[in-house]
Amino acid sequence: MKRKTIIITSNSLDHEVQILTNELKNRDFIVKHFIPKRFIANVSDFKEEFRQINPKIGLVRGIGIAPTQKIFYRLDLLSAIEKIGIRLVNSRESLEIASDKFLSSLYLKMNNIATPKTFVCENNLDAMNAFEELGGDVILKPLYGSKGIGITRLNDKGFAENVINTLYQLNKVFYLQEFIEHNNQDIRILVLGDQAIAGMYRINNCWKTNIHAGAKMKPLKLTEELRELAIRSAHAVKTEIAGVDIMESNKGYQVIEVNSTPGFTALQKVSNKNLSKEIIEYFLNST
């Protein structure tokens, strides 16, 4: 009898979701894609949706970007799935921490992991005070988001005031992080459980180092220091499958964030390992 599992995703046609699905099918699994935004939750019999496939474990590849109320509901769905006995990788708790930049930074700091100085607030005047406190050169990020979307560097007081006042009118939360000089490059490391599997440099001609911002990949030989730092960072935010972003600075390595649904296409181009295979093998062996 074929084994069964689910992949939780915001887009079943996503290229990486398809690759991971095929890896599972090649191992004789029946795979169902669970898309939170299309799910109708029957509170009276929540198990019904899963009774036919009856998975023991599910792979989480994202719940999508949405207004706050919908995000909370989708996280609630993950909690409900775990409550009926399905183990999720990564867990609902992991997704909540890693996708919230405030919580992610806080958990890193609480675990004695070097991370840039950061202030989070709601008031525009407080945000300007934080801008000054951080030296007048900061990175302003959305509290939730990925791929570098919505990230802005503020290093001019007048421009900072305009941006902050505009966002204040839109009822946004301000996440302000000191700018770290990093020679327009950073490091991404893929962590699976207690192992750092692969890493790469991301290099750009500007301060943004996301692949979606045009950064190029370069192979990275993982040192023991980087391996240990990446694994500690993933554990700090309770994440089993993680993409850990690290910058080299004059203060040493600084962990910027931990991604709980890391992409692997770019990293695969500079790695001699089959990353989708590594991810699925970890996933299946983690039950």
Regions found by a protein language model. Name each.
Residues 11-117:
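Conserved N-proximal alpha/beta basic substrate-recognition cap immediately N-terminal to
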Residues 2-6, 53, 78, 83-84, ...:
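Active-site nucleotide/adenylate-binding loops and adjacent lid/helix of ATP-dependent enzymes
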Residues 63-65, 144-145, 261:
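Short glycine-rich anion-binding loops that position phosphate/pyrophosphate groups of nucleotides
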Residues 177-178, 239-250:
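A short glycine-rich, hydrophobically flanked beta-strand micro-motif that places a catalytic Asp/Glu
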Residues 221, 235, 248-287:
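C-terminal active-site "lid" helix and adjoining low-complexity regulatory extension at the edge
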Residues 149-237:
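Phosphate-binding site of ATP-dependent enzymes
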Residues 7-10, 192:
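Short hydrophobic segments within beta-strands
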Residues 175, 197-198, 242, 254-256:
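Protein kinase-like catalytic core scaffold
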